[in-house]
Regions:
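Helix-loop-helix junctions within the multi-pass membrane cores of secondary transporters/permeases
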Residues: 1-14, 18
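Hydrophobic, membrane-facing alpha-helical anchors
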Residues: 13-29
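The feature marks cytosolic C-terminal regulatory regions of anion transporters and related permeases
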Residues: 24-189, 193, 199
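Short aromatic/basic micro-patch
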Residues: 151, 212, 249, 283, ...
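Short acidic-hydrophobic, aromatic-tinged amphipathic segments that line or gate anion-handling sites
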Residues: 205-217, 221
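Cyclic nucleotide-binding regulatory module and flanking cytosolic helices
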Residues: 220-272, 310, 320, 381-383
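Cyclic nucleotide-binding regulatory domains
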Residues: 266-335, 343-350, 354, 365
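Polybasic "coupling" helices that flank or enter modular domains
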Residues: 362-384
Length: 384
């Protein structure tokens, strides 16, 4: 019954009511922004926007509501002008300049050398919002009719608003009517961009065949589709061992002799052929399926793809010849079949059939030379 105690109680109740009302007054956009940050989306744009919110709140508390609103409007105008003046499309080129890391047999590579010009790559940077979305639409309008795929690399995009998401959906539909396919690199169902697009009601169908974790995978999918459209055999087709790159220039009897020194091994999808750091005592000839060489032994999203091999090619020869351990791991992308040749088997052929062994070493050298030439050519094209 003490009046002072009653006063404290009333003040506490009023304070709670005021805090509840204050929290309810926070706009949904800020709630969503904080939710994105708490959900792990820590991009530069999110940090910048949170900093602006904190700045405006601090000015409001310090100088009052009117000054806070004025400061918020001024900062928003400055950020808007900067984003409007920033070019959303950082670079534009074709897959001729930036092909995938998959290595193809010579016949397929010869076809793709020109066909890659039909894969247009647009690297985006900044925020995809209503002000920049229109510029992206204009960029897409000037893409030639000969293009088969348009790949948007969204890894440099900090945020996507509702208008940006709608533009991507409309762009996908519009290109589809023209017989072209839109691919989004840097977008998966678990990625913030993927969640944002679906939250805005876009790209709701699942699973998505046009979303890829990175640009390399998107370009590879486009290359494989171009090969399929042209009726050229893909990696699922088995290739005879004598038609592989290791057996070039050998007659039937020599092929049989070398094959007698090799062992066949079948791999299930996802099975490891060798791990990073393993002893390098074999080279492998892939006759069916596909094998990818990756760095790191952790979860898939933490591993870096170096190269993927198609049927008919050899791998693991460099580490075997120099005697070092495996510098990366290799995993089967799908059911695969490989023939392995040990260093001891190659040495035995050298003693018993010097001319045959010389041809094998020559084929290995040509294989390595072709990979080096390809890497050099790509670097020269990328640097102008």
């Amino acid at each position: 019954s003490n009046p002072r105690v009653k006063g404290y109680f009333i003040e506490a109740v009023l304070a709670g009511i005021m805090l509840t009302v204050a929290v309810a007054m926070v706009d949904r956009w800020t709630h969503r922004l904080i939710g994105q940050w708490r959900g792990g989306e820590r991009s530069a744009d999110v940090w910048e926007t949170l900093a602006i919110v904190a700045f405006v709140c601090a000015i409001t508390v310090w100088r009052g509501f009117a000054v806070g609103v004025a400061a918020g409007v001024l900062v928003a105008l400055l950020v808007f002008m900067r984003n409007m003046n920033r070019s959303l499309v950082r670079s534009r080129h074709t897959a001729v300049i930036e092909p995938s890391r998959r290595v193809y047999p010579q016949a397929q590579e010869d076809f793709l050398r020109e066909a890659r010009s039909r894969i247009v790559l647009l690297e985006l940077e900044g925020a995809l919002f209503f002000g920049s979305a229109e510029r992206l639409a204009r960029e897409a309008d000037v893409i030639g009719a000969d293009a088969r795929f348009v790949v948007l690399d969204l890894r440099g995009v900090g945020s996507i608003d509702a208008s940006g998401a709608m533009l991507l959906q409309q762009l996908s539909t519009g290109l589809g009517r023209r017989g072209q396919t839109l691919m989004l690199a840097g977008v998966t169902a678990e990625h913030p961009h993927g969640r944002r697009l679906r939250a805005f009601g876009c790209f709701r169908e699942a699973p998505r065949s046009d979303w890829f974790a990175d640009l390399d995978r998107a370009v590879e999918a486009a290359e494989l589709q171009l090969l399929s459209d042209a009726g050229i055999a893909l990696g699922d087709t088995a290739i005879a061992l004598q038609d592989s790159s290791l057996f070039v220039g050998l007659d039937a009897s020599q092929c049989a002799l070398v094959q007698g020194h090799m062992q066949m091994r079948r791999l299930a999808a996802g099975e490891v052929l060798f791990r990073e750091g393993d002893p390098a005592d074999h080279l492998y000839v892939l006759t069916r399926g596909s094998i990818t060489v990756v760095a790191g032994n952790g979860p898939e999203h933490l591993r870096q793809r170096f190269v993927s091999f198609s049927a008919g090619l050899m791998l693991g020869e460099t580490a075997m010849l120099d005697g070092g351990g495996r510098s990366a791991g290799a995993t089967a992308d799908a059911e695969a079949e490989v023939f392995q040749l040990t260093q001891q088997g190659l040495d035995r052929l050298g003693r018993e059939q010097p001319a045959l062994a010389s041809q094998l070493y020559r084929n290995i050298a040509v294989h390595l030379s072709a990979r080096l030439r390809r890497a050099t050519s790509l670097r020269r094209q990328a640097t102008g």
